[in-house]
Amino acid sequence: MNPREEKVKIITEEFIENDEDADMGRQNKNSKVRRQPRKKQPPTAVPKEMVSEKSHLGNPQEPVQEEPKTRLLSMTVRRGPRSLPPIPSTSRTGFAEFSMRGRMREKLQAARSKAESALLQEIPTPRPRRLRSPSKKELETEFGTEPGKEVERTQQEVDSQSYSRVKFHDSARKIKPKPQVPPGFPSAEEAYNFFTFNFDPEPEGSEEKPKARHRAGTNQEEEEGEEEEPPAQGGGKEMDEEELLNGDDAEDFLLGLDHVADDFVAVRPADYESIHDRLQMEREMLFIPSRQTVPTYKKLPENVQPRFLEDEGLYTGVRPEVARTNQNIMENRLLMQDPERRWFGDDGRILALPNPIKPFPSRPPVLTQEQSIKAELETLYKKAVKYVHSSQHVIRSGDPPGNFQLDIDISGLIFTHHPCFSREHVLAAKLAQLYDQYLARHQRNKAKFLTDKLQALRNAVQTGLDPEKPHQSLDTIQKTINEYKSEIRQTRKFRDAEQEKDRTLLKTIIKVWKEMKSLREFQRFTNTPLKLVLRKEKADQKADEEAYEAEIQAEISELLEEHTEEYAQKMEEYRTSLQQWKAWRKVQRAKKKKRKQAAEEHPGDEIAEPYPEEDLVKPSPPEPTDRAVIEQEVRERAAQSRRRPWEPTLVPELSLAGSVTPNDQCPRAEVSRREDVKKRSVYLKVLFNNKEVSRTVSRPLGADFRVHFGQIFNLQIVNWPESLTLQVYETVGHSSPTLLAEVFLPIPETTVVTGRAPTEEVEFSSNQHVTLDHEGVGSGVPFSFEADGSNQLTLMTSGKVSHSVAWAIGENGIPLIPPLSQQNIGFRSALKKADAISSIGTSGLTDMKKLAKWAAESKLDPNDPNNAPLMQLISVATSGESYVPDFFRLEQLQQEFNFVSDQELNRSKRFRLLHLRSQEVPEFRNYKQVPVYDREIMEKVFQDYEKRLRDRNVIETKEHIDTHRAIVAKYLQQVRESVINRFLIAKQYFLLADMIVEEEVPNISILGLSLFKLAEQKRPLRPRRKGRKKVTAQNLSDGDIKLLVNIVRAYDIPVRKPAVSKFQQPSRSSRMFSEKHAASPSTYSPTHNADYPLGQVLVRPFVEVSFQRTVCHTTTAEGPNPSWNEELELPFRAPNGDYSTASLQSVKDVVFINIFDEVLHDVLEDDRERGSGIHTRIERHWLGCVKMPFSTIYFQARIDGTFKIDIPPVLLGYSKERNMILERGFDSVRSLSEGSYITLFITIEPQLVPGESIREKFESQEDEKLLQATEKFQAECALKFPNRQCLTTVIDISGKTVFITRYLKPLNPPQELLNVYPNNLQATAELVARYVSLIPFLPDTVSFGGICDLWSTSDQFLDLLAGDEEEHAVLLCNYFLSLGKKAWLLMGNAIPEGPTAYVLTWEQGRYLIWNPCSGHFYGQFDTFCPLKNVGCLIGPDNIWFNIQRYESPLRINFDVTRPKLWKSFFSRSLPYPGLSSVQPEELIYQRSDKAAAAELQDRIEKILKEKIMDWRPRHLTRWNRYCTSTLRHFLPLLEKSQGEDVEDDHRAELLKQLGDYRFSGFPLHMPYSEVKPLIDAVYSTGVHNIDVPNVEFALAVYIHPYPKNVLSVWIYVASLIRNR
């Protein structure tokens, strides 16, 4: 018995011995047990499916006894790589047991035959292996198996495990005794292989019989309980295995089950591929070019003969040497790859460039000392010999002797500019020069030539070449037509440029002539006799229209065809890019899916992130061609460059038919100029080889600045002329002559003799700077034709000299020319070899016609690269006029040295980021730390910028809530960008101090002062102020700038008031204006308040300063008049870290100076502990604030003064009444103003230098004389009082200069305001002032970055709902004028605004000063008036400048009728011309929308409540709805009474409704512009900082709408604490 039969026998014996025990075990099982595929289980889980369940018919104790066996089975199966599925069990006996035994015998009998056949095929190798199928073998490359093939690797691991288990099973089999197997039963090994072996599939015919027997022996219940195993990865199916493991003798079987191979793979012979098949497959896949010579006819188009350019005399260059075999291979490959034969030339050879390698090296090789140096390579040193350049001009001994003569004819001189030119002479010279250009262009008529050429080319394209000619193919015809089309495009471009030049030149001539005429009319005299006449030539309009339309249609069709071709090309590129993008996206998805699968298979492992790749952007399809757009472009271009059919042809004619105004009719300055011209004379010196040989006579300078000499100089010479020079000298009166310029004359050719020499003109210029005190414009000095000095010109002295130079002719008719020496001939012949241009003579380069003639006679090859520069120079010079581009290239070889293409550079994200930063785009201005690589730059960097470009015309209402204000903000942004772009170039200038930071070098005066100071007596009690050092913006960074706020003292702080006290005051309406504003102390003497016990603290105020969310506060003082004298320091951070001047000027941050009252509350609950402990809580109550914009501090450098505190009209728990004893001294100083005040000193450390305003000249429609008068008026005022503000002209919103009085005109206020107090003019004026103050304030320094100050008209101001002090003041002044008041616009300086605008009115015999931004008014002698000095007053018809000694409003007289006090602009010498106003005739107001205001009110209230809750993240915020409702009903009363006389009633109402609460709150009133200022104002009050546990809040918002969408916003914020 062989070993294979022994294995089968052992398995059969073990199976029979355990048969009885297995029957008993089946009775204890359920009717069916679920089968499951065998898989690896975790060692801690015991699979319940493997354990026998309790039988319904058996003893319940039996499964307990068999538990060790069951656990052994479970543990054994757990350790293996697979688990056997349990066989279905049944509870039936008798026939069921017999049928089960029969089925098992049949199965074992069938399995034994299969196992024997499988074992016969087993190869006795030490390790079972599996051969891959040929289909899988093809997937393997020479670099290894493909990464996606997981099946093969899994099979190898399974084979490795099977090998180890087979070895263990063999060793176990040798130890165990081999029981005898009854005949007819399989052995143990056969039984094991039957259940665990993977059999290879057999032919279908041999498999059908076992399957049939298997079906016959299986009942219906067993078929339902069986499950199919999923197909294995090796390709075959694993058979189901039945669990037959019960009984004591199953240990053998279990021991073998754990370590036996689960498959045996059949081994087949390896696949073999014959060499013949492999060669055949390579022939099909690869192309091997032939080495045979290709006939010439195959390399040329059909019916085309080869053309040899070298035989035709054209230069072709030397081709590089290539082996003939390689050429044949390449030719065969190209013919197969490209059948169109584009790689072959006309001669049938492959196109090749000339060999670029030089025949000899440019430098000798560097040899080491060990290497031998050949004699040919040794360096030969020769001493340098100085070359005598003048030897070619010296007559040598070998030359024939004789006298030679050169004739120089100087006919005259004309100045194209002279210092004595008047402005009219400048225009006349320009007009004459333009007219000469016109005549020259008209004579050439290049536009007509190009038009004819364009028509001929179009005819050639339409006709086409004759296709019947045998020597022309379709490719050649198409190539020729493409060349024609390209030439048509170029010719059309040149034609349009020429026509535009002609039209522009004609327009310029007419413009200069009009300027000349207007100048003559302005100056009322004439200096030049020039006269221009425009002659109209009528043409056939119908024919012109037809030709015009035909040309446009032809151009449209050509452009349409070009765009169609371009669109097809772009579409092809788009398809290619789209395919690439789709392929890339597919690869990315596959990678993503693979990473996801790897993460699911290995959830605990960290998967390395792949290297970031550049994302491909999905390409966009090109836009199709639009005929309408092309037609519009063609018609616009034609309208610019061509004459329209209905326009006549204008022919200018310039003549000297005019008359010059005599001296007696000219002003004194012009007479002085003419007399100065008469004093001047001119003469010329003639220099030969830098030696003076003669000079002309001195001729006086004519009135037309022409000088006629008419002299011929005969120079007897013996040497060749090296140089001929004329020096122009000018003499003024009896002074010494002055050299103006030198004129270098060309040396004539030997063929130029006297009598045939043409007269030529040579230009000259001078660099002298001459300034004159008369009407002469000077030389090298800027001057202007404008009255305001704009558009300045700087002209230098220049002119032309008419002359001719020729060789003289002797008596015998022989020219007296020095002959060329032999040495000179040799020298020129040597030059001819090196340079072709040098061999044609010295003057050959100056005469291009001679140069072209010489090139034609010498028959130069135009295709020779050595002659390319010369041929290009000749073609440009002989074409009449070349096309001069509008640019020049700094680096002509830039494209050759580019590292990447322009397209790739534009795709670079880093380059784009750098480019946007250099352009100062707002999103990237001052952007720092740009990454080095593109992959490190995220796409989201450009999201904001691209979104802004996309949403350029989209109105975003998210930040503004109100749609109208969103539109206004968008419009202001566009105006801001327009202004910034306009002044961007003008701002690019720097002072020396901006670029160089250095200490000033002390001079003798500074040193002297320092020495004197050392000797001065020191006075410590009176220190002197030292000037602070100023710094510039580029030296700053975060943390360098500090904001210093010095809190000095405060006056009349509201004091605490018991809740029970009430005051009876008359109502506001019952008090007259005279009572309110009388200056008597009795009106303001308060009654003594007896509610406070003696010695009780009235108020404990402290000041808190917040800036950029940084908060500092002072110590707590006591009393209503506290004194702190403390300095607070706050850091300043510029937006985006940009400390440039423009960035600092546009900062919108505000400094909030809040005054709080510190209140101590006793919170000790048990009075028994009051003697032993103190428990108090500090609360702070907001009393008022002062707001200071940072822009004001930045421009003023320091703010010093006393400011009124903005105290809410209702301050619960506090009273504004003062104590008689404490306030008696202070009341005597008070006049008209009420309120609380605080003294501050604010500055920036270090001191910053604000940018200087750019004084640019703007367009203006004002009269020129008026603008000149304004400049003169401002200059006179600034000369006497340089620090006072004088304003005569302003810039409107369109960028034009407007006289300032045009802005003042009576304009009607809203009728709704006039109806409130119909009989009280003063109350109406206050209401109108309050309406103006409700319009939001927006300084121009913030809007336009300090560039300029734009003035808008009143209707524009009301539409924009934003403006600075000037717009508010103009609107208020216009309202007052309409009310019949005497009102002026007052320009001066105020605190804290700086230069500002107020309104001055005359009321009941006294002057009142109105602040338009706050709506308050002050008396002239009010010490608390914020206006500190007065510069000028502006009325509707005049301007008055303050020329008084004092400038404070307290000390000046406002009577403008006194000329000694006020300097008026319009006077007797300059009467008022009756200027029209730029304001509209009347203002149209839209009715207020109360529904929109109510909706806006609810949204703002919701936003503020959310903000307060966000500001209290650690505390719960409770809202008292009852109190909120009470406050909401109270706010309309505040708006109606303007916040006056309602405090007591409101306090009583709150005490009545909320008596058990301690209430602290206040209303805030602001004009509405946007939400952010409202949020900042609420935040600055600190109402959210209360951390009492049982605190409740109330917030109410009320918006009252006024006409023109002006909104008044009231915000009532309160905190409530329940009394214990």
UniProtKB/Swiss-Prot annotation:
Changing R1330Q: In JBTS9; uncertain significance. Residues 1025-1203 form the C2 domain. Changing W1519G: In MKS6; uncertain significance. Changing S117R: In JBTS9; uncertain significance. Residues 439-493, 532-582 form a coiled coil. It holds the Pfam family CEPT76_peptidase. Changing K507E: In JBTS9; benign. Changing T1517S: In MKS6; uncertain significance. Signal peptide: none annotated. Residues 29-41 have a biased composition (Basic residues). GO terms for biological process: axoneme assembly; camera-type eye development; cilium assembly; determination of left/right symmetry; embryonic brain development; heart development; kidney development; motile cilium assembly. Strongly expressed in prostate, pancreas, kidney, lung, liver, retina, kidney, fetal brain and fetal kidney. Lower expression in spleen, small intestine, colon, skeletal muscle, ovary, thymus and heart. This is Coiled-coil and C2 domain-containing protein 2A. It comes from Homo sapiens. The lineage of its organism: Eukaryota, Metazoa, Chordata, Craniata, Vertebrata.
